[in-house]
Swiss-Prot record:
Residues 1-22 form the signal peptide. This is Serine protease HTRA1. The record marks Y169, F171, F278 as: Involved in trimer stabilization. It comes from Homo sapiens (Human). SMART domains: IB (SM00121), KAZAL (SM00280), PDZ (SM00228). Changing P285Q: In CADASIL2; loss of proteolytic activity. It is found in: Cell membrane; Secreted; Cytoplasm, Cytosol. GO terms for molecular function: growth factor binding; identical protein binding; molecular function activator activity; serine-type endopeptidase activity; serine-type peptidase activity. InterPro entries: Growth_fac_rcpt_cys_sf, IGFBP-like, Kazal_dom, Kazal_dom_sf, PDZ, PDZ_6, PDZ_sf, Peptidase_S1_PA.
């Protein structure tokens, strides 16, 4: 008689379930069962655990009970118990112990699975992690704090792993390490009108371009200051002399007298810069020396005319690296560590500008020629503001960001008023828009610069919020 297929189905399921149930009974044990081990672990049958174990705790041969493991260097592999935490049983020639080895009656030693040194929280260096754990167990037995791992490698030294991700891909850190020694912090002082006491009024950044102490920075950083002090990365300070200034380009050259050769930065070719390149800005914002920010090049040729500077021949580098007054004058560098610009201007978050290195080269060449020919540098007039020309598109953008922005579409927008300057004394404030001077309409920042050169008194009308305010500013004549 033939048995129907449907009747065979329950029998088939029972046969499939049998090995599964056997596997479940040994759950929690990944190793093959040793001889004499029960089919199912019963924790209630485990012997009492000792309070202290020299080698740490481990599972017995059956994988059921926690027992004291053998310490590092102890025998293992025959009748001895398992090795302790982090240890493995190794027979001569470094072969891990196995069932085959045990059957051949070969004994082994408990060896730490980790061979590199580690530094403990007790300031001691241990040959491996197992020795540190043993020290921690001894410490706890004496009712002292446990010893924890602080770092790989010996105490007091780093662990250099050339194959680690941070070692392979931290190219920004490599650039900073290369350029930082040649970046300087600049502190500026002025004398008080009545007491003649000098007070610090501002700070900025610069970078060394010659081994004998020539330093490039922004013109607005050093102009109208009675004393300029330069601090190197090693903390040494020097008095600096202003050698040359180009206010239109906003580049200045200062010099310190230093014995010995100084580290220098080389200028790259800004004309070869591409949008999307990584750049690093370094400087001293808020007097925090060697502060690093990173970003990409947004565009390589943001023309001064696009910024509303009608008579400007400057093509700025636009970047989203953070630039502010403190790191003005510091270098903007590429990943080769070459200077491709001077940090100079921040319009708003994510929109900053740098003077291209090709302009710096031109300035340094012309400065060398002037000094070689002995030409005197004439005094210049200064009021102490940083400004940009306002256009309808920029006015709309600023109004979207600042609800109280004035309802104007042209003029000179004041980005910053430098402390202790004629502009501050006259009452100008950040975000003011200059709309006329001495009865003449102001359309761009160049209009303001032209009037400053010609006039000794500036009667300004500025738009502040929704009000027009009359302000008088008297420019100062300064040594560039």
């Amino acid at each position: 008689m033939q048995i129907p297929r449907a009747a065979l189905l329950p029998l088939l399921l029972l046969l499939l379930a049998a090995p599964a149930s056997a596997q479940l009974s040994r759950a929690g044990r990944s190793a093959p069962l040793a001889a004499g081990c029960p089919d199912r672990c019963e924790p209630a049958r485990c012997p009492p655990q000792p309070e202290h174990c020299e080698g740490g705790r481990a599972r017995d041969a059956c994988g059921c009970c926690e027992v004291c493991g053998a310490p590092e260097g102890a025998a293992c592999g025959l009748q001895e118990g398992p090795c302790g935490e982090g240890l493995q049983c190794v027979v001569p020639f470094g072969v891990p112990a196995s069932a085959t080895v045990r059957r051949r009656a070969q004994a082994g030693l408990c060896v730490c699975a980790s061979s590199e040194p580690v530094c403990g929280s007790d300031a001691n260096t241990y040959a491996n992690l197992c020795q540190l754990r043993a020290a921690s167990r001894r410490s706890e037995r004496l009712h002292r704090p446990p010893v924890i791992v602080l770092q790989r490698g010996a105490c007091g030294q780093g662990q250099e792993d050339p194959n680690s991700l941070r070692h392979k891909y931290n190219f920004i850190a490599d650039v900073v390490e290369k350029i930082a020694p040649a970046v300087v912090h600049i502190e500026l002082f002025r004398k008080l009108p009545f007491s003649k006491r000098e007070v610090p009024v501002a700070s900025g950044s610069g970078f060394i371009v010659s081994e004998d102490g020539l330093i490039v920075t922004n013109a607005h950083v050093v102009t109208n200051k009675h004393r300029v002090k330069v601090e190197l990365k090693n903390g040494a300070t020097y008095e600096a002399k202003i050698k040359d200034v180009d206010e239109k380009a906003d580049i200045a050259l200062i010099k310190i007298d230093h014995q010995g050769k100084l580290p220098v930065l080389l200028l790259g070719r800004s004309s070869e810069l591409r949008p999307g390149e990584f750049v690093v800005a370094i400087g001293s914002p808020f007097s925090l020396q060697n502060t690093v920010t990173t970003g990409i090049v947004s565009t390589t040729q943001r023309g001064g005319k696009e910024l509303g500077l009608r008579n400007s021949d400057m093509d700025y580098i636009q970047t989203d690296a953070i630039i502010n007054y403190g790191n003005s004058g510091g270098p903007l560098v590429n990943l080769d560590g070459e200077v491709i610009g001077i940090n100079t201007l921040k319009v708003t978050a994510g929109i900053s500008f740098a003077i291209p290195s090709d302009k710096i080269k031109k300035f340094l060449t012309e400065s060398h020629d002037r000094q070689a020919k002995g030409k005197a540098i004439t005094k210049k007039k200064y009021i102490g503001i940083r400004m940009m020309s306002l256009t309808s598109s920029k006015a709309k953008e600023l109004k979207d960001r600042h609800r109280d922005f004035p309802d104007v579409i042209s003029g000179a927008y004041i980005i910053e008023v430098i402390p202790d300057t004629p502009a501050e004394a006259g009452g100008l404030k950040e975000n003011d828009v200059i709309i006329s001077i001495n009865g003449q309409s102001v359309v761009s920042a160049n209009d303001v610069s032209d009037v400053i050169k010609r006039e000794s008194t500036l009667n300004m009308v500025v738009r502040r919020g929704n009000e027009d305010i009359m302000i008088t500013v008297i420019p100062e004549e300064i040594d560039p």
